[in-house]
């Protein structure tokens, strides 16, 4: 998984601070780690937006003004309901060798018999939760659907073992559906309206 450096600054949590930060193009955030006090920080809005909307997961190397760097993951993001801009973020520090849970984006590849028969790929999830050491977790997971038949669904328990390769494990119910090949939509035939018969008086 790629490591991205993100410069951060401490903040005071004073009244109206969040509003002031946003006018300066910054987003308030908090960083936490088990056994440590939470740290209140702010980050550049554009840099954070780029990370949040990236199609891949990243390890975030938070860079503080005193020169210290701490590895972290984005754990939660809040969006403005009107503008859809990021208005707050939670980061989690982690230590070397620490096992964490995180979401990893999913992509699909292949064109199997189900697609050849006119079926549609229906992605039922856009990310999967996995558990492992962050350095062993991929930035995205690609699932091959080239063997899937029309009407077939792949569940978490059916993801090939070589995807994780013993480096991480999937979290969630084994029966959770991930992707389906659905039947093509059949358009109903249009019927011509019959003109009412005219009667002679």
Swiss-Prot record:
Task: Report if keyword Ribonucleoprotein is assigned.
Answer: yes
According to the record, the residues making up region (Disordered) are 179-201
GO CC terms, sorted: cytosolic large ribosomal subunit
**Which Pfam families does its entry note?**
Ribosomal_L25p (PF01386), Ribosomal_TL5_C (PF14693)
Sorted keywords for this record are: Ribonucleoprotein, Ribosomal protein, RNA-binding, rRNA-binding
* Annotated SUPFAM superfamilies: Ribosomal protein L25-like
Query: In what ranges is there compositional bias, type Acidic residues?
Result: 190-201
Q: Does the keyword Ribosomal protein apply?
A: yes
For the biological process aspect of GO, one term held by this record is:
translation
**Which GO terms fall under molecular function for this chain's record?**
5S rRNA binding; structural constituent of ribosome
Superkingdom of the organism of origin: Bacteria
- Membership in a protein family: Belongs to the bacterial ribosomal protein bL25 family. CTC subfamily.
Function summary: This is one of the proteins that binds to the 5S RNA in the ribosome where it forms part of the central protuberance.
On subunit structure and binding partners, the annotation says: Part of the 50S ribosomal subunit; part of the 5S rRNA/L5/L18/L25 subcomplex. Contacts the 5S rRNA. Binds to the 5S rRNA independently of L5 and L18.
Q: What is this protein called?
A: Large ribosomal subunit protein bL25
> Which species is listed as the source?
Prosthecochloris aestuarii (strain DSM 271 / SK 413)
